[in-house]
């Protein structure tokens, strides 16, 4: 692994705290998105009216925090390991980052494969999180949710929607890493020099690199989220069912019984959450990496 990018512990710690910060700040958006997707007749206004207290907006924060912080730590460590292996012998870096620079197809593949692998590992937490956030299950805690799924559906219940999740997360992550790395190269050239500060070696200062990385993350996440939105709706519907429902069956039901537009339910909320989450998580990740290096 490239020494410039730090060792595995640095990526684990940086990814963990980046993911944790983003989920604590943005959990209300995730909860509203889940409830908006669970029923075809819902509107954001009606979902908000059903929220009884402000505290309820943070329902499911614990499983979300576990999934996102652990998932981010594992994903970013695996992503860096695979990218560093492909970049071995190369010293190419962008001005705002310690991460290795790869060709576009390599960014696409490493992002997609790393996310698919970590997504399967964290799938049980994801299922519990979605059930906990919805209004269809009145769980009083994670232990109760875990026992109920195990007793009623068995081990298979913890991996419900795995195919839809992989079809959503792998393309999203691949597109995101590709776009993110390109944006980090383009933004310093596109922005006025007065907005950017650099040291004697040409590397951007901490405030400038944080701005470039944050804006790059926001823009990349916005586009990747829009393109993969239908898979998110299908995944949520599958995970909320107590009986086995397939990917194709769920897709056919939404398109034929409801309307194709339903596939994009919750997009505005997911767009806000994913874009801001990427901005927070990747911004913290990249800057913590420099401090720990």
UniProtKB/Swiss-Prot annotation:
It is a multi-pass membrane protein. InterPro entries: Hem25/SLC25A38, Mitochondrial_sb/sol_carrier, Mt_carrier_dom_sf. Mitochondrial glycine transporter that imports glycine into the mitochondrial matrix. Plays an important role in providing glycine for the first enzymatic step in heme biosynthesis, the condensation of glycine with succinyl-CoA to produce 5-aminolevulinate (ALA) in the mitochondrial matrix. The lineage of its organism: Eukaryota, Fungi, Dikarya, Ascomycota, Saccharomycotina. The keyword Magnesium does not apply. GO terms for biological process: glycine import into mitochondrion; heme biosynthetic process. This is Mitochondrial glycine transporter. Belongs to the mitochondrial carrier (TC 2.A.29) family. SLC25A38 subfamily. It is found in: Mitochondrion inner membrane. One of its GO terms (cellular component) is mitochondrion. PROSITE patterns: SOLCAR. GO terms for molecular function: glycine transmembrane transporter activity. It catalyses: glycine(in) = glycine(out). Keywords: Membrane, Mitochondrion, Mitochondrion inner membrane, Repeat, Transmembrane, Transmembrane helix, Transport. The chain crosses the membrane at residues 12-37, 60-86, 108-133, 161-184, 212-238, 266-284. Solcar repeats lie at residues 6-85, 102-186, 208-291. Its main location: mitochondrion.
């Amino acid at each position: 692994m490239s020494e410039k990018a730090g060792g595995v512990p640095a990526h684990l710690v940086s990814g963990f705290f980046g993911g944790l910060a983003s989920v604590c700040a943005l959990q209300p958006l995730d909860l509203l998105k889940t409830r908006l997707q669970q029923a075809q007749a819902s509107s954001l206004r009606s979902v908000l009216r059903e929220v009884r207290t402000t505290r309820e907006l943070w329902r499911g924060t614990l499983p979300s925090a576990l999934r996102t912080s652990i998932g981010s730590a594992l994903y970013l460590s695996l992503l860096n390991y695979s990218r560093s292996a492909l970049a071995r012998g190369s010293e190419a870096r962008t001005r705002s980052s310690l991460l290795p620079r790869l060709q576009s197809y390599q960014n696409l593949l490493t992002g997609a494969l790393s996310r698919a692998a970590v997504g399967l590992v964290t799938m049980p937490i994801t299922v519990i999180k979605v059930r906990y956030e919805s209004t269809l299950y009145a769980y009083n805690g994670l232990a109760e949710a875990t026992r109920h799924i195990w007793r009623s559906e068995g081990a298979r219940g913890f991996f419900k929607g795995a195919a839809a999740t992989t079809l959503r997360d792998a393309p999203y992550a691949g597109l995101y890493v590709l776009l993110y790395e390109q944006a980090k190269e383009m933004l310093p050239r596109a922005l006025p020099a007065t907005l950017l500060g650099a040291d004697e070696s040409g590397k951007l200062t901490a405030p400038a690199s944080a701005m470039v990385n944050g804006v790059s993350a926001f823009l990349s996440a916005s586009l990747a989220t829009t393109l993969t939105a239908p898979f998110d709706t299908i995944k949520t519907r599958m995970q909320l069912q107590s009986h086995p429902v397939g990917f194709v069956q769920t897709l056919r039901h939404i398109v034929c019984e409801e309307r194709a537009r339903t596939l994009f339910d919750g997009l505005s909320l997911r767009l806000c959450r994913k874009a801001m989450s990427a901005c927070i998580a990747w911004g913290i990740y990249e800057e913590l990496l420099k401090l720990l290096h």
